[in-house]
From Swiss-Prot:
Principal place of residence: secreted
Gene, per the UniProt record: LGALS1
Subunit structure: Homodimer. Binds LGALS3BP. Interacts with CD2, CD3, CD4, CD6, CD7, CD43, ALCAM and CD45. Interacts with laminin (via poly-N-acetyllactosamine). Interacts with SUSD2. Interacts with cargo receptor TMED10; the interaction mediates the translocation from the cytoplasm into the ERGIC (endoplasmic reticulum-Golgi intermediate compartment) and thereby secretion.
One GO biological process term: apoptotic process
Residue positions, PTM N6-succinyllysine: 108
GO molecular function, one term: lactose binding
Species per Swiss-Prot/TrEMBL record: Ovis aries (Sheep)
Record's GO cellular component terms: cytoplasm; extracellular space
Residue(s) carrying N-acetylalanine: 2
Modified residues (Phosphoserine): 30
InterPro entries (alphabetical): ConA-like_dom_sf (IPR013320), Galectin-like (IPR044156), Galectin_CRD (IPR001079)
Modification type N6-acetyllysine: residues: 13, 29, 108, 128
Name under which the protein is recorded: Galectin-1
Residues where a beta-D-galactoside binds: 45-49, 53, 62, 69-72
């Protein structure tokens, strides 16, 4: 998946929220948001799949520790629409990350790396970022 935005030295602390808003491509197959320490140490790989890798309208989440992927977690809540604007809010603490989807639905993903700060963000695929905010 081609990488678009990459940001480092974010110093996002527990309890703070990262809000990402962007445009989903009209012909979207999938996109991803990655958060963590760096590209090889991700506490969250957030990957909405419209029709990719055998998944249809499914959000796949994972982590990467030292370059090794963990076990995938799938969410069937899928409020994303091709050709629309979408916003995702992500916050975290020592035990898990909370992902709030555009329709208000929230789910949790374990903080497997036990990160105390998130310093890295990357985005790729069929999603054009318009705004990144820290709250």
């Amino acid at each position: 998946m081609a990488c678009g935005l990459v940001a480092s030295n974010l110093n996002l602390k527990p309890g703070e929220c990262l809000r990402v808003r962007g445009e989903v491509a009209a012909d979207a197959k999938s996109f991803s948001l990655n958060l963590g320490k760096d590209d090889n140490n991700l506490c969250l790989h957030f990957n909405p799949r419209f029709n990719a890798h055998g998944d249809i309208n499914t959000i796949v989440c994972n982590s990467k520790d030292g370059g090794a992927w963990g076990a995938e977690q799938r969410e069937t809540a899928f409020p994303f629409q091709p050709g629309s604007v979408a916003e995702v809010c992500i916050s975290f603490n020592q035990t898990d990350l909370t992902i709030k989807l555009p329709d208000g639905y929230e789910f949790k993903f374990p903080n497997r790396l036990n990160l105390e700060a998130i310093n890295y963000l990357s985005a790729g695929g069929d999603f054009k970022i318009k705004c990144v905010a820290f709250e």
